[in-house]
Amino acid sequence: MPFAPQIPDGSKTPGDPDLFGLSDGGEAFSKNLLPGDGRVFYRSGLLEQPVADESFKALLSGGFWRNDEVVMFGRRRVLSRKMAWFGDLPYAYAGALKQPVPWDAEVLRLKSRVEQAGGCVFNSCLLNHYADGREGMGWHSDDESSLLPNGPIASVSLGARRVFRFKHRRTLEQVEVWLEHGSLLLMEGETQSHWVHALPKSLRVREPRVNLTFRVMREP
């Protein structure tokens, strides 16, 4: 299930408006942010400011948030960061099993918007709520066996502007991008195999952020 069409003649780049079916007149995707071994595209204006504000407010007040849990050194640890998992199947990562909750109307609305922009159908979504810059995410990759291998991952950012970093597993080369309110980041191809990514903590950030990561789960 390819996320972006192949470009056999090199005549188009991810910035071309028609490559991702961007018929809404919004911002175009960037060119590939990675130097190789994967594909990452960024679009700053997926949602207009009023729409992004409305979505952010609706999600913050959602009743689906739960404290995230991880298993470290055989012990279960409850994190301050809130999360929610939407989909038909449970999702296991960091040693803990996340049970799905019923799809929320606002999440479905954003899912439809992302699918329209990216040309792919997603069947699950992981939400993370970062209260401020004291909460972040360390180096990791989204390569769980329950996910479609080399499948697309689409990340929508709402709220505080945060830096997002990629690091190549072998060369340790790093790439960073600032994720704006209402933006979309697309990861596809072999990105998860060759790169890890992180959301660094920052005491300068005092506002909350909500991140929606749309994924494709394997059918059982």
Model-derived features: positions:
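Non-heme Fe(II) oxygenase metal-center motifs and adjacent flexible, charged/small-residue loops
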Residues: M1-P220
